[in-house]
């Protein structure tokens, strides 16, 4: 039974509402930054508290009004929880709906609270009453005049939103447009979801002005006059601010579920507000720091404002223990981590950097489809790109928008029409297209007509991640082409590191006779073929690659001495008369090369660099036309030797070449050769065995001096740790080095191993 008492509707009810839901505990002492502003705004509320002693009756009257307003405005059920401050929490319900065929009525129950948030919670947050009123007032296409259902004036509500001591409240703006009519099952124009889901302003012509811009109202002018949704709580409403035709709404099932979440415990939350508005321990505010990055990407925030938003959200909202940002976030809110409510400050302060480094190993291929498991980073920082992994653009790796890792702080949206994370205010199709086209780093902005534009860097990073140092060692970074990960070139997804002898080609076992013994071949004939090929290899190395001059000063990579090259034109340079091999220190052996590589000073090193540059030019010029380099006479002999080797080895090189060709045809994979042979004869082998078209000379390394493991470290330094490395070889040395680097190893010991590798590549397992 409800007793209706006479009440003066001209007087504001701010004081009653505040006193009605006031916690019955000892209030902590809070220091406000501006006491005059608080006293000025809540002066009426203090007078009303002294004049109205009937608290319980007005309490029941207010509850009945809220229930009636909730039932009548079933088309736009927006029931918001109050601010997280346990010091002085007020209850406000903002109801804004596009009623009728063209009009939008913005109503709200204003609130005033003499108690505000603690000092660290002072940045502006809009209240329910003020923003519900302003949303109806500034709604585009509003056919009816603004109706303020609260007895507080619009000026009072709007000025209260500016106060430093205002309670934190979420809100819902439902801008009724000419196309938004009353739908079925409680769905009308405007996003009808829980207010915690949609922190989005739909007014496109004017925004709520404030002196200190909150993350929800950052730079409305940057989006052509539209207020881009900031998605402070990780979810978006998929509404389109500039779409003049219709307003995108979520499904009625989501709205019904959202209403049921609150309605089922309406009385419980209402009467026990002082316990419930300090969130229960099974809700987690774990993802609140990540909302700053989401807001920055959505509203195109500059780094200064982004840092302010991150600093605002993390200490004042998450670290203070007020982690009810996900109280009504989604039906899946119960699946969040447990027990972090009482230790919110401990988690955010002590373990704030736990997710900062990318401390997972991208090298271990645990399954054939392991590339998909690295599609989303498991441990990422708040300002880093969530989708920075190179597998996002692979054609065979699908990108699922709603798929997150088990430890991902981003909630899973229950509706396919709602955006994920930074891709708010964009339709699902446009979000997927932007994600796939820009490598997962697109920033969805609300353009005219809802067209999503992407903002990305060539490496797939966001603008704020530009220029950061890579968290990787650089053991032997030496030259221009063998440098770290360049910002202008996206690193490959997979790097296949091949061994040369007995993996890609059969050569040493032919010379030793072990291949003939294993496969019961003619020992003498195979050795004869092998010796002929060996002679051709060393002739090419001596004639064209200066092997007789640089044998004792062999390098690991073709560009290791390029820093000593002054770029002199070598077209008319005479290498035979430059005195390179005669400038030897007194008393030194004839072909001594010191460990540092310095033999005859700067001039000698420059001449050595000239030779390696000439080797590089010859390789690049004749890699696809070796017969021209050999000459007509040697060309026929070379083709004959290759044909005989193919017959003797049962087309071993042909099978390996198929695997190499399949990898080289992929846009995001690269073949790298690491051989124990010296660099000059290794280049001759590559050309003579027909592999020059596959391997660029920059992708060939010699492990003759430094070993395979050091070569692998240099390769990782060059391509970066985000790539996946697969080592393919036949010996124990390659396998040991691969295990030391945590690289998967594919052993090649027979023809069946090459066929299995080809099948794995063809099926997309590698």
Swiss-Prot record:
Name by which UniProt lists this protein: Protein phosphatase eya
Keyword presence, Ribonucleoprotein: no
Gene this chain is encoded by: eya
Enzyme Commission designation: 3.1.3.48
Biased composition (Gly residues): 89-110
Compartmental location: Nucleus
Textual note on the cofactor: Binds 1 Mg(2+) ion per subunit.
InterPro entries per the UniProt record, alphabetical: EYA, EYA_dom, EYA_dom_metazoan, EYA_dom_sf
Organism lineage string: Eukaryota, Metazoa, Ecdysozoa, Arthropoda, Hexapoda
């Amino acid at each position: 039974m409800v007793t209706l008492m006479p009440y003066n509707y001209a007087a504001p009810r701010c004081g009653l509402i505040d006193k009605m839901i006031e916690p019955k505990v000892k209030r902590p002492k809070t220091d406000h930054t501006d006491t005059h502003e608080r006293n000025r705004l809540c002066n009426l509320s203090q007078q009303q508290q002294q004049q109205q002693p009937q608290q319980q009756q007005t309490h029941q009257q207010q509850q009945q009004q809220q229930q009636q307003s909730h039932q009548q405005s079933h088309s736009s059920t927006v029931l918001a929880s109050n601010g997280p401050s346990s010091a002085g929490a007020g209850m406000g319900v903002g109801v804004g709906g596009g009623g009728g065929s063209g009009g939008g009525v913005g109503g709200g129950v204003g609130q005033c609270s003499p108690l505000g948030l603690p000092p660290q919670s002072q940045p502006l947050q809009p209240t329910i009453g003020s923003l519900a009123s302003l949303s109806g007032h500034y709604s585009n296409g509003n056919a009816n005049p603004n109706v303020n259902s609260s007895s507080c004036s619009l000026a009072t509500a709007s000025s209260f939103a500016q106060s430093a001591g205002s309670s934190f409240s979420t809100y819902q703006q439902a801008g009724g447009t000419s196309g938004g009519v009353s739908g079925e099952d409680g769905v009308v124009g405007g996003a009808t979801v829980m207010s915690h889901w949609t922190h989005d302003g739909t007014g496109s012509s004017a925004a709520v002005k404030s002196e200190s811009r909150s993350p929800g109202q950052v730079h409305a002018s940057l989006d052509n006059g539209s207020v881009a949704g900031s998605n402070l709580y990780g979810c978006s409403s998929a509404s389109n601010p500039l779409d003049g035709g219709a307003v995108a709404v979520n499904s009625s099932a989501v709205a019904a579920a959202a209403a049921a979440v609150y309605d089922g415990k309406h009385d419980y939350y209402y009467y026990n507000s002082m316990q419930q508005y300090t969130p229960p321990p099974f809700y987690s505010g774990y993802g609140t720091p990540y909302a700053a990055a989401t807001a920055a990407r959505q509203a195109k925030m500059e780094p200064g404002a982004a840092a302010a938003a991150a600093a605002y959200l993390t200490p004042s909202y998450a670290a203070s223990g007020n982690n009810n940002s996900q109280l009504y976030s989604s039906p899946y809110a119960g699946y969040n981590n447990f027990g972090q409510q009482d230790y919110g400050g401990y988690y955010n302060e002590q373990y704030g950097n736990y997710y900062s480094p990318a401390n997972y190993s991208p090298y271990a291929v645990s399954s054939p489809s392991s590339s998909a498991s690295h599609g989303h980073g498991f441990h990422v920082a708040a300002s880093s790109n969530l989708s920075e992994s190179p597998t996002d653009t692979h054609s065979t790796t699908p990108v699922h928008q709603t798929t997150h890792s088990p430890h991902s702080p981003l909630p899973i949206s229950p509706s396919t029409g709602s955006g994920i994370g930074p891709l708010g205010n964009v339709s699902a199709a446009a979000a997927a297209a932007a994600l796939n086209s820009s490598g997962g780093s697109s920033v969805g902005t609300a353009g005219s007509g809802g067209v999503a534009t992407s903002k990305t860097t060539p490496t797939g990073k966001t603008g704020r991640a530009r220029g950061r140092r890579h968290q990787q060692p650089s053991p032997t970074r030496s030259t221009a082409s063998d440098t770290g990960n360049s910002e202008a070139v996206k690193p490959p997804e997979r790097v296949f590191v091949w061994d040369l002898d007995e993996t890609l080609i059969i050569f040493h076992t032919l010379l030793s006779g072990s291949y003939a013994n294993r496969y019961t071949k003619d020992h003498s004939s195979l050795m004869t073929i092998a010796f002929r090929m060996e002679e051709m290899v060393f002739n090419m190395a001596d004639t064209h690659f200066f092997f007789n001059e640089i044998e004792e000063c062999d390098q690991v990579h073709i560009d290791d001495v390029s820093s000593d090259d002054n770029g002199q034109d070598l077209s008319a340079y005479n290498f035979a008369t430059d005195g390179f091999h005669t400038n030897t220190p007194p008393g030194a052996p004839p072909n001594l090369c010191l460990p540092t590589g310095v033999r005859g000073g700067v001039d000698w090193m420059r001449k050595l660099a000239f030779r390696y540059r000439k080797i590089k030019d010859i390789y690049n010029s004749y890699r696809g036309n070796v017969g021209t380099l050999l000459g007509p006479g040697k060309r026929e002999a070379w083709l004959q030797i290759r044909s005989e080797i193919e017959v003797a080895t049962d087309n071993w090189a042909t099978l390996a070449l198929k695997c190499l060709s399949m990898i080289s045809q992929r846009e995001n994979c690269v073949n790298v050769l690491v051989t124990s042979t010296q660099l000059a004869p290794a280049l001759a082998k590559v050309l003579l065995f027909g592999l020059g078209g596959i391997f660029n000379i920059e992708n060939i390394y010699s492990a003759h001096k430094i070993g395979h493991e050091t070569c692998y470290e240099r390769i990782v330094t060059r391509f970066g740790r985000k790539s996946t490395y697969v080592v393919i070889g036949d010996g124990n040395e390659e396998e040991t080095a691969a295990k030391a680097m945590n690289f998967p190893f594919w052993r090649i010991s027979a023809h069946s191993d090459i066929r299995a590798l080809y099948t794995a590549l063809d099926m997309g397992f590698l």
